[in-house]
């Protein structure tokens, strides 16, 4: 795999991590949303990653140093709804309360969502750094060619 293959992998990871950060931010923003267009509380969403163009390790290992093998990348296979039931809170004066006075709130833990958001941010930063390093290697290679 060449430098451009490395850049393609990191670029796909940037896109996937950006989407994960957006979904996590939406979860945080709607942590107290008790009424949606569907009538119930907001449902937490989760991003599922998948490997695209993945090859078995032995195939990649045998092809080391050649550009014939397409680079693998990461993609988002789907965004799924969390199946955790809503948290019921007793609030008899709330307009969204049921007959017993309970309101269904999303099963979202803001602390774990913040950890997920920080994780997505760090992964994004690392992939951006990998792209910068690959660009710097290409630039230095061009500089070497200019001097010869």
Put a short name on every predicted segment:
Residues 1-148:
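Amphipathic alpha-helical polymerization modules
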